[in-house]
């Protein structure tokens, strides 16, 4: 009987129960495991995280309005955006940036992108003065040097055709004396260019012919609009130069 009682006591002890000498059952209390407090204090403000910033009601209303206008998810994103925009002023006032380095690099890239887009929308007269632009891109320096070299080495005919006076149709024979133009440029400009690029004798002949045949040229044009190429008038009637040659005994 004693052996059985000892075995029963051992089984009871394994179950967490103790049997007293009187035969009463006593529940054994399990050992309580004490948890260690966390090493990191979650209530402390790490780098201002979770802080409530007090601001005037006007500023708070403006931040709330900007959050909706910019499509941000929270007011914190709007304040972060405002800090990025004001970073140059912050650096100018404090000497150092108050935002992390990652924000600084991002803001620099954002500012570079905004500057490039703003420059693209500006007119070319404000960007390069007289610098030529092709589809928003400036002509390279080597092309400029080649163009200047070509302009310096061209002959008289090319220099004459690059003038903005328009297209001139000059007869091959000087005795015809007809000068027709598409642009309707004044004849003084043409005579001045002829003075620089042709012989003085030919210029003198042109002046005499134009003075002598002023009325005949006006009558020959007829109903044609001035400033247009009137080849029909010069081909239909005899030229005053040919009339003068018939009358001249020479």
Swiss-Prot record:
Boundaries of each TCP domain copy?
Answer: 39-93
Q: What is its main location?
A: nucleus
What are the entry keywords?
A: DNA-binding, Nucleus, Transcription, Transcription regulation
Name the source's superkingdom: Eukaryota
Places the protein is found: Nucleus
**InterPro entries reported for this sequence:** TF_TCP_subgr, Transcription_factor_TCP
Q: Which GO terms describe its biological process?
A: positive regulation of long-day photoperiodism, flowering; regulation of DNA-templated transcription
Q: What is this protein called?
A: Transcription factor TCP7
A GO molecular function annotation here is: DNA-binding transcription activator activity
Native species: Arabidopsis thaliana (Mouse-ear cress)
Kindly state one GO CC term assigned in the UniProt record.
Answer: nucleus
